[in-house]
Amino acid sequence: MQVTLNNSFTVKQPIAKVWSLLSDPRQVATCMPGAEILEALDDKTFRGAVKLKLGPFSAQFKGEVVIERMDAKTHEIRMVGKGKDAAGTGNATMTISGKLTEEPGGGTRMESQSDLVISGKIAQFGARMIEDVSKSMFGKFTEALTARLEGRAPSAEAGAISVTEVAGAVVKGAVGRLFGKGEKDEGGA
């Protein structure tokens, strides 16, 4: 199953500060619920893990993230992560492309596209649920990133994505689609 997500958000921080954080995978991982960097293999390749818990189903994907492109001049980055569920029940590949632009007044806007390809048990949840959960995760990521940029402790939990978060994301997504709001930018600050 393949899911493509387009997200954007704006923070009231200078582009150089935002780029400094987003170009460091170790710092990015601290803002992602359930994610951690286990080891740097070189300056562009990292071994990591992501924990998910969807109701009775839980998974821990372990794999590698490779920075394919990082341009400090244009503030563009492209990363590819590939992982396997530790229990052998699935695989995931995610390609993330992001670009930062300066906003009037000194803020920074980030636009990203994520292409996620999953197989195995987790794919049984369907594209809509995976999309809704991914949007919820992106929201938590932007909250944690903003907190870190402002010098506050991120509120994103280090643990796995929980069934409560999944249910909330699914209900929010379904209600939004029902009333025609499901396709709008939900990551803005």
Question: Model features per residue range: what roles?
Answer:
Residues 1, 40, 55-59, 88-92, ...:
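A generic structural micro-feature
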Residues 1-45, 49-53, 163-189:
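Hydrophobic ligand-binding cavity/cleft-lining segments
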Residues 8-10, 51-53, 66, 99-101, ...:
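Generic structural detector for well-ordered beta-strands
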Residues 18-22, 28, 67, 112, ...:
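Hydrophobic pocket/interface hotspot
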Residues 40-83, 189:
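Glycine-rich portal/gate segments that line the openings of hydrophobic small-molecule binding cavities
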Residues 69, 82-133:
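Beta-strand/loop substructures that line and gate deep hydrophobic ligand-binding cavities in soluble
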Residues 121-160, 167, 171:
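A conserved amphipathic terminal alpha-helix motif
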